[in-house]
Amino acid sequence: MIENIRIRNLRSIHDSGIIEFKPIMILLGANSSGKSTFLRSFPLFTQSVDKKLRGPISWFDSAYVDFGDYKTAKNRYADEKEGISFEYTYSDLVSIDRRRFYVRHGNYVYSTELKEGSFSFELKGDSKGTFISKISIHTVNVSFGLSVNDRNDNINFVINGISFKSPEKLFFNYNTAFGILPSIASNKSSNSDNDVSGYSLIYNRLIGILISVPLKSGPVKY
């Protein structure tokens, strides 16, 4: 369940602050304070996942909302280096498909590790359109960040505050199909069993953190 949301640099919203979701919500504010922008941000994502895109966001859809493009959607007072960002805090995440979290060698990942945390991403624009420049994921024991300065840059990985160096180039693939987040692609072409890929190193590092702190809730084996 999503507990709260924070929006930065979308139209008239420079920084919404943390907005907690309630069963009944009343938005109060002066004209052009961001009330309609906040409400329209939800169908913005609906129209973006309803179609195949060459990027993360569909800024315009005749059936939903029209934000124009990245340039017109960005807050005019935002710094040039800043992007449009969305941050969500979640709890009681019970819809995890456990089959997707297979851990090699019989290691265990504790259910509490994945059950609550926060997630955020930042959008930026260039001559080709809109792209995701930053993704951050925080769980009980893991802080995981991925970022690029340009859509074609190597991904910068930071795990619990420590930069991670991949042995090969890993970059975002923005050709999403009915989704918003990019996939991670590699320029690695060798299939040798002796090669250690960046995927494996990241995977092993994250799993090592997740299984290192036993919790009272007991382990879940994937």
What are these regions (language model features)?
Residues 1-222:
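P-loop NTPase switch/coupling surface
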